[in-house]
């Protein structure tokens, strides 16, 4: 048994156009694209944000296999979301048992939305160092006069994202240790295998609490108070390419909005 790869929270250093973009531009672009994905009116218009996201993945030069591995790590979450959609709607014509045609379309839409949002989040974390992500959040909040709040939110999000791959590696280490002691996670019934995972979950929670305490002590020892720094070792500079990127992603959102409010839906179940 081997745990799947977790990409969210991992930065992949590659020299690409996407890596060289200003982190503020990438954050704004991600917000625009996620908004576009959430308000898509029909299946046809999923091509608009979908192609934009796949173009970002291609230009980032990190490889499509990495993104697929990241999706595999979240398969249980995706399947659960689809099953919830299957049984959450009783409207429409029944196809099988309690499942209706409207529920099937809802499941298709929620699956597409989740996959595209996950791919976009993976692309952002793979092309943006965690510290620059925090800088981007702080800078955007500073524009509205809330620099301290932006700094705190950025720091919390950075630490949370950095903990994802750390905990994934820790879970893999615990899994190998339990297998070496004779534990078997691949035999038995489904619920038996779920119960067997307790020997991984409990040590993982203890390890997570220990690492969080160590991080808190380290930050306190370095006199971290939560106040944003007055100076920076290296400033981030906005370039014309960043403006172009933000305009293009905003254009994707505008196009989807146009399709939602001015174009008749191809499949009405998605509206």
UniProtKB/Swiss-Prot annotation:
Topology versus the membrane: Multi-pass membrane protein
GO molecular function, one term: riboflavin transmembrane transporter activity
Keywords, comma-separated and alphabetical: Cell inner membrane, Cell membrane, Membrane, Transmembrane, Transmembrane helix, Transport
GO CC aspect terms: plasma membrane
Pfam families: CbiQ
Compartments, record wording: Cell inner membrane
Regions that span the bilayer: 38-58, 66-86, 104-124, 149-169, 197-217, 243-263
Presence of the UniProt keyword Transport in the record: yes
UniProt cross-references to CDD domains, sorted A to Z: EcfT
Biological process (GO), any one: riboflavin transport
InterPro entries: ABC/ECF_trnsptr_transmembrane
Record's subunit section: Forms a stable energy-coupling factor (ECF) transporter complex composed of 2 membrane-embedded substrate-binding proteins (S component, RibU, BioY), 2 ATP-binding proteins (A component) and 2 transmembrane proteins (T component) upon coexpression in E.coli. A stable subcomplex with both A and T components are also isolated. This complex interacts with at least 2 substrate-specific components, BioY and RibU.
Function as written in the Swiss-Prot or TrEMBL entry: Transmembrane (T) component of an energy-coupling factor (ECF) ABC-transporter complex. Unlike classic ABC transporters this ECF transporter provides the energy necessary to transport a number of different substrates. Expression of the complex plus RibU in E.coli allows riboflavin uptake; uptake does not occur in the absence of RibU or the EcfA1A2T complex.
Annotated family: Belongs to the energy-coupling factor EcfT family.
Name of this chain's protein: Energy-coupling factor transporter transmembrane protein EcfT
Organism: Thermotoga maritima (strain ATCC 43589 / DSM 3109 / JCM 10099 / NBRC 100826 / MSB8)
Record gene name: ecfT
């Amino acid at each position: 048994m081997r745990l799947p790869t977790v990409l969210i929270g991992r930065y992949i250093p590659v020299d690409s156009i996407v890596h060289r973009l200003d982190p503020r531009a990438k954050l704004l672009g991600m917000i625009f694209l996620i908004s576009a994905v959430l308000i898509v009116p029909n299946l046809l218009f999923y091509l608009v944000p979908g192609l934009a996201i796949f173009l970002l993945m291609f230009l980032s030069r990190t490889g499509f296999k990495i993104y697929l591995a990241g999706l595999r790590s979240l398969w249980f979450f995706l399947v659960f979301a689809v099953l919830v959609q299957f049984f959450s709607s009783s409207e429409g014509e029944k196809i099988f048992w309690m499942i209706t045609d409207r529920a099937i379309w809802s499941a298709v839409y929620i699956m597409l939305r989740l996959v595209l949002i996950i791919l976009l989040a993976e692309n952002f974390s793979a092309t943006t160092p965690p510290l620059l992500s925090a800088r981007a959040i702080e800078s955007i909040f500073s524009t509205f006069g809330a620099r301290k709040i932006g700094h705190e939110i950025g720091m919390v999000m950075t630490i949370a994202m950095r903990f994802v791959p750390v905990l994934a590696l820790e879970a893999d280490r615990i899994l190998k240790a339990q297998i070496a002691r004779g534990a078997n996670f691949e035999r038995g019934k489904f619920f038996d295998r779920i119960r067997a995972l307790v020997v991984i979950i409990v040590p993982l929670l203890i390890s997570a609490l220990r690492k969080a305490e160590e991080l808190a002590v380290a930050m306190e020892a370095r006199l971290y108070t939560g106040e944003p720094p007055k100076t920076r070792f290296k400033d981030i500079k906005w370039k014309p390419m960043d403006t172009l990127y933000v305009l293009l992603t905003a254009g994707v959102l505008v196009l989807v909005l146009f399709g939602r409010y001015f174009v008749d839906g191809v499949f009405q179940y998605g509206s």
